[in-house]
Amino acid sequence: MAMAEPLCVACIGMGWWSDVLADAVKRSGKLKIVACYTRSEEKRQVFAKKYGCRAAPSYEAVLTDAEVEAIINTTPNDVHLATTRMAAEAGKHIFLDKPIANSVSDGRKITECCKQAGVVLAMGYQRRRESHFRWIKRQIDAGVFGKLVNAEANISRDRLR
């Protein structure tokens, strides 16, 4: 699939983060939102009106839409594998919001199905370049913590401000 500019995308999964990404798409000028889908008819219509795109009646309609070259997937994490696999099999490139999946196994399946389909899979891990993450990576690489076998982190922030 040849990609032209602007790249025509469909947004799937409507929530506050889909609006944040859609606003960024509009500012970029490199992408154009042409369709959207979420299970809620009301949310679809509101999003379509706000961003000037078509409200698709089903996810399958998005995937068979020849104008749609890629999807922005902000669906719940537990359906990332199913929604991404369907998009890849339809030849659509994918921007997938983090985390890739709820399990390593599903994450591997997602990357494999995109690889097999020959589509681009882009992940929305926006924090990896922040200074405190680079600092902790240097500490890990320097062996400060010994042999690292597991790590867990929680980032909390006040979204109401």
Regions found by a protein language model. Name each.
Residues M14, T74-T75, I155:
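Glycine-rich, N-terminal phosphate-binding loop of Rossmann-like dinucleotide-binding domains
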Residues C53-C113:
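Beta-loop-alpha module in the N-terminal Rossmann-like domain of NAD(P)-dependent dehydrogenases
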Residues M1-Y51:
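N-terminal Rossmann-like dinucleotide-binding module
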Residues G13-L21, L63-I71, A117-V119:
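A broad helix-preferring feature
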Residues A35, E69-A70, N150:
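Short, Asp-centered acidic motifs that coordinate Mg2+ and/or phosphate
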